[in-house]
């Protein structure tokens, strides 16, 4: 900081004569410069003129102005992040019901959910090592909910995730030219995590198997993790019926650690609760 000499002070006092102060500012008699009433910091400084003699007194920001600016920028960044997450959820969770697949909505009945939480907690390591999951087991045992909880939790952390299924993918590919299909499949690599739900429900036509292979192989080559859910048994995946299935399943088994879902049918349990609620409604009497 420049020492305020008598010469400089005279220049400061001359400049101060015509200055307009804001309501939270005052001129400090000690140095003649503009200060903040709140923090007492300088809002004016003394700078030597470059290349010639003399000085000028530009405005500067005080501590509380600096903090206010940092808070404003932080608030703007939070807003941008929220909007970005909202867009990513709209893109990554293509079915609205998936928004409800969250850890907050977990009823605690499935002990495997601890593994879902662990996957999220160790996501950086999983991503670095291209570690995926293969969730297999009977219908209604919570595989999709497990995967959806991971998807929502990572999306909330601003991680790009896509949760989809092969019928949806194949429907989108129908009618596309070869170049467009390649671009569409390559677009999956924009997501740090790709979740394919219900592998095995799609029709096993030659065209479908070829496109499924392209999707899985593209993901395999990108070295980015994927999570697969399926009602198929592990033995079926390890002993595929033909070469077309083998090419797909081998890549999945290499990249995805298998987790067996062999508990109760939660979907049937929920359906029973729904039936009871409906029964209570239709049998109730108005007063």
Where are each of the predicted segments found?
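Hydrophobic/aromatic beta-strand patches that form the interior of the parallel beta-sheet core
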Residues: 133, 162, 195, 227, ...
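Walker B catalytic acidic pair
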Residues: 198-199
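Loop/turn-to-beta-strand initiation segments
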Residues: 159-160, 190-193, 222-228
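Short glycine-rich substrate-engagement loop in P-loop NTPases that contacts/grips substrate
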Residues: 111-120, 128, 151-191, 203-210
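Pre-Walker A (pre-P-loop) alpha-helix and adjacent loop at the N terminus of AAA/AAA+ ATPase modules
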Residues: 93-133
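Walker A/P-loop nucleotide-binding motif
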Residues: 127-147
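A short, basic N-terminal segment
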Residues: 1-107, 269-287
